Amino acid sequence: MSSGGLLLLLGLLTLWAELTPVSSKDHPEFCELPADSGPCRGILHAFYYHPVHRTCLGFIYGGCYGNANNFKTIDECKRTCAA
């Protein structure tokens, strides 16, 4: 491969690395999901990871369905998503 081709390849790889979200490298994809209380009407205090603020926040979980970005404790949320 010519030096021009190698430079082009290096440039494309650098661009790809810059455009790849850092969050996908640091924690599971479900940490990017929004808080989802679910359709049930329970009042359970839970925590979810907020990817923009890069921290765990509290929310009210209804008790069913929702998504995987749902933790019983803030420590569990931090260990899973904010590490």
UniProtKB/Swiss-Prot annotation:
Q: Where in the cell is it found?
A: Secreted
Q: Point out the annotated site residues (description: Reactive bond for trypsin).
A: 41-42
- Which Cys pairs are S-S linked? 31-81, 40-64, 56-77
Which stretches make up the BPTI/Kunitz inhibitor domain?
Answer: 31-81
Q: Which GO terms describe its molecular function?
A: serine-type endopeptidase inhibitor activity
The record, for PROSITE patterns, names: BPTI_KUNITZ_1, BPTI_KUNITZ_2
**GO cellular component term of the entry, any:** extracellular space
Q: Does the keyword Disulfide bond apply?
A: yes
- Does Secreted appear among the keywords? yes
Tissue specificity comment: Expressed by the venom gland.
Which keywords, in A-to-Z order, does the entry hold?
Disulfide bond, Protease inhibitor, Secreted, Serine protease inhibitor, Signal
Q: What is its main location?
A: secreted
Describe the task this protein carries out: Serine protease inhibitor.
Which named protein is this?
Kunitz-type serine protease inhibitor scutellin-4
Q: Which organism is it from?
A: Oxyuranus scutellatus scutellatus
